[in-house]
Regions:
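Short, flexible, glycine/charge-rich loop motifs used to bind or transfer phosphoryl groups or to couple energy/partner
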Residues: 19-21, 43-45, 62-65, 87, ...
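Small/polar loops that bind or transfer phosphate-bearing groups
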Residues: 7, 32, 57-58, 100-101, ...
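Structural detector of well-ordered beta-strand residues that form the stable sheet scaffold
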Residues: 6, 31, 74-76, 96-98, ...
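Short gly/ser/thr-rich secondary-structure transition/capping motifs
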Residues: 34-39, 56-57, 128-136
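N-terminal glycine-/charge-rich "phosphate-binding" loop or analogous flexible N-terminal tail
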Residues: 1-51
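Phosphate-coordination loops involved in phosphoryl transfer and adenosine-cofactor binding
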Residues: 2, 72, 144-147
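Glycine-rich NAD(P)-binding loop of Rossmann-like domains
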Residues: 126-152
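Phosphate/diphosphate ligand-binding glycine-rich loop within oxidoreductases
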Residues: 51-127, 141
Length: 152
């Protein structure tokens, strides 16, 4: 019998379908959130009742939702926080909970560098002016003239 997986996170597999291919290769039937927004409790209860696993976004997995999940063995939370999962209740029901604390690390670092460069070169201001039909040169500051520090 095929294992079933509910994916609440949105979007999932749209930019890169590698995770979906891996699930198919593992013969895991999956359901991707069809609502393009967080599930309500009622929607979660409907979808979670017959699944073995959940890849969860930030949807609230409450006691009521977990109680309706009769076959659930594992919740894998995308991202760094677990505050959307009632951990004590999950444990009492024998549901394992995992998460990806370092998952967004590289993306956050890359985005930070992007914002630094955009700020230094005033690209955002230039874009706004151009959208308003104004061609104005924003020179900004070059990296070679700067000392850049990142805290955090």
């Amino acid at each position: 019998m095929r294992k079933k997986l509910l994916i609440t996170s949105i979007p999932f597999g749209t930019e890169d379908n590698t995770p979906l291919k891996l699930l198919e290769e593992a013969n895991i039937e999956y359901i991707i959130n069809p609502f393009n927004q967080k599930f309500t409790d009622e929607q979660l209860i409907h979808y979670i009742k017959d699944v073995d696993y959940v890849i969860a976004g930030t949807d609230k997995l409450s006691i009521k939702v977990l109680d309706s999940a009769k076959k659930l063995k594992l919740i894998s939370r995308l991202g760094i926080g677990l505050d959307s999962v009632d951990l004590l209740h999950a444990k009492s029901k024998g549901i394992r909970v995992a998460y990806t604390p370092d998952g967004p690390t590289n993306s956050v670092a890359e985005y930070t560098l992007c914002l630094i460069l955009l700020s230094m070169r005033q690209s955002y201001r230039s874009n706004i002016a151009l959208r308003d039909g104004v061609w104005k040169k924003f020179i900004g500051t070059s990296i070679e003239e700067s000392k850049i520090g990142i805290f955090g």
